[in-house]
Amino acid sequence: MDSEDIPDFSSLKEETAYWKELSLKYKQSFQEARDELVEFQEGSRELEAELEAQLVQAEQRNRDLQADNQRLKYEVEALKEKLEHQYAQSYKQVSVLEDDLSQTRAIKEQLHKYVRELEQANDDLERAKRATIVSLEDFEQRLNQAIERNAFLESELDEKESLLVSVQRLKDEARDLRQELAVRERQQEVTRKSAPSSPTLDCEKMDSAVQASLSLPATPVGKGTENTFPSPKAIPNGFGTSPLTPSARISALNIVGDLLRKVGALESKLAACRNFAKDQASRKSYISGNVNCGVLNGNGTKFSRSGHTSFFDKGAVNGFDPAPPPPGLGSSRPSSAPGMLPLSV
């Protein structure tokens, strides 16, 4: 306190009271300051303890954060290495995939070319198939015709068998007629000596006409006829059936000639049928080879039609050599084709 602030006292009591009052005032302020100091110290201690606790927590947190930071650094390093490794692998995979893509594109181009070639080949094969189908239909049609013709010829063959039976029966009848003719000639020789001359001449003329008609075969007769039909001179005396009239004998011989001519025609048809069957078998094998070649080359095979309508005559029918038929027994047989083998009955 400055000396200028001290007032002037009139008495000692006033000065003493002033200083007492001033000391009390300072004492009170000191007490308040000390209380405030104590409060401040207590508050500072509490604050210091709290700050120390916060510091400990902060240090612990800092250590944890540092540990986390270090761990994260390690993880970052590991991730960097892993990323670099993955990047290298992905780069290798991308390069491999690019190579595969280029190869795949090349293969795709080749496959496109191959598909186009296959389509062209398929078109060629379809055309060849259509041509082959047409050829096979034609062949089947001709084969069906041949089958029908074979069936017809088989029916004719059956008819020929029945005719052969009839021919054999007629041959037997002709042999009997020849035997009867021989007996009749002998009887006429006997009666010629005893009868007058004019009736004998008439009988001789009639018998010579009948013998001439019997000596001429109804079919072409060859060397085998001499063995099959014995001549009247070679037949010994025997007992025949009842004698027939000359007209009946001539009609019977005409029937035999017609039957033999029919048998010859049937045998020629049978030979033609056999040759046709052989020709069809060889043609079928030839056609199968040509069809396979046509499928490979894309061209259908065209088959030429050849009609097997010609009849083949035999060199000898039932052992007879070909000879012109006698007049009055019908038209002659069709001409025979060369190289045909005879069929024996």
Curated annotation (Swiss-Prot):
> Which residue windows does the record flag with biased composition (Low complexity)?
329-339
Q: Where is the lipid attached (S-palmitoyl cysteine)?
A: C273
Region Self-association: start and end of each range?
56-166
Which residues does the annotated region (Required for localization to the centrosome and interaction with dynein, dynactin, tubulin gamma, PCM1 and PCNT) include? 256-291
| UniProt-annotated stretches for the region Required for interaction with PAFAH1B1 | 114-133
Q: Where in the cell is it found?
A: Cytoplasm, Cytoskeleton; Cytoplasm, Cytoskeleton, Microtubule organizing center, Centrosome; Chromosome, Centromere, Kinetochore; Cytoplasm, Cytoskeleton, Spindle
UniProt-annotated stretches for the region Interaction with CENPF:
175-345
Under the cellular component aspect of Gene Ontology, which terms does the record hold? centrosome; cytoplasm; kinesin complex; kinetochore; microtubule; spindle
State the residue spans of region: Interaction with YWHAE.
Answer: 189-256
What are the boundaries of the region Interaction with DISC1? 241-280
Its family?
Answer: Belongs to the nudE family.
Quaternary state and partners of this protein?
A: Self-associates. Interacts with DISC1, dynein, dynactin, tubulin gamma, KATNA1, KATNB1, microtubules, PAFAH1B1, PCM1, PCNT, and YWHAE. Interacts directly with NEFL and indirectly with NEFH. Interacts (via C-terminus) with CENPF. Interacts with ZNF365. Interacts with PLEKHM1 (via N- and C-terminus). Interacts with GTP-bound RAB9A; the interaction may lead to RAB9A-dynein motor tethering.
Q: What is this protein called?
A: Nuclear distribution protein nudE-like 1
Organism of provenance: Pongo abelii (Sumatran orangutan)
